[in-house]
């Protein structure tokens, strides 16, 4: 089973990926930053907010998605949180099609 984790280099993402890998899962990691991603994971580079029709394939055709990506994560009052909601929805819908 292939599991895609977005926000892979974030605090939660790094811990989720490590646990999945320790349990023997095949992990595909996606993030704008790559420095802290566990080297055992396969890194997929793609803009999750793009309207690319082949985004699912570019992200490794995962069986499971754990979507943890969130721009400006700890800046709780950042306008980007509201502005990005439609993009998150579009990404999730694209991954289900």
What label would you give each PLM region?
Residues 3-23:
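N-terminal Rossmann NAD(P)H-binding glycine-rich loop of SDR-like oxidoreductase domains
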Residues 90-97:
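Conserved Rossmann-fold NAD(P)-dependent oxidoreductase catalytic core, especially the SDR/UDP-sugar
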Residues 36, 48-90:
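NAD(P)H-binding glycine-rich loop region in Rossmannoid oxidoreductase-like domains
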Residues 1-5, 59-62:
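Long, low-complexity, intrinsically disordered polar/charged segments
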Residues 41-42:
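Short, conserved active-site loop motifs that form the nucleotide-linked donor/cofactor pocket
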Residues 25-36:
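Conserved glycine-rich Rossmann-like NAD(P)H-binding loop of the short-chain dehydrogenase/reductase
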Residues 45:
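Conserved residues in the N-terminal Rossmann fold of short-chain dehydrogenase/reductase
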């Amino acid at each position: 089973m292939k599991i895609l984790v977005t926000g892979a280099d974030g605090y939660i993402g790094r811990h989720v990926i490590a646990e999945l890998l320790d349990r023997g899962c095949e992990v595909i990691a996606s993030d704008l930053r790559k420095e802290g991603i566990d080297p055992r994971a396969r890194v997929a580079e793609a803009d999750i907010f793009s309207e690319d029709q082949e985004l699912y394939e570019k992200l490794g055709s995962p069986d499971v998605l754990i979507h943890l990506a969130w721009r400006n994560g700890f800046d709780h009052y950042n306008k980007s949180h509201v502005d990005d909601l439609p993009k998150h929805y579009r990404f999730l819908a694209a991954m289900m099609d």
